[in-house]
Structures are given as structure tokens and as C-alpha cells.
Amino acid sequence: MMEEEVRDAIISELKRQAETNPSKLKLAEDGERMTVNGEVDLAALAMAIVGTIAGGP
């Protein structure tokens, strides 16, 4: 379903950002919930979501 694809894209992008800059972004997952603490690059997050909707890689 599209919702799952978008959800996965969001999680993947947030994890990528946290791995790239762990001092600025921390994530904690708990089942279907995620706690996000720190700076998020919204442009990169939006691109990941749009890419998923458009059928990108």
C-alpha cells in the first residue's frame, strides 16, 4: 500500500539523517512509534517522500 511505502521512506530518510549526523539527530523506535529528537532536513525528507510517490528508487 502507498501508506506503507511513504512510512518506510520517512523512516529510512530519518535513519539516514541520524546516521550522517548522530550528534544532531537521535531516533528511538518503539513498535509503530518513533521519537525524533534534533534537527531534521525537511527538504531531504520531502524529496524522499515525493520520490516514493513518484515511483523513484
Model-derived features: where do they sit?
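Protein-protein interaction and targeting regions used for scaffolding, dimerization, and localization
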Residues: 1-57
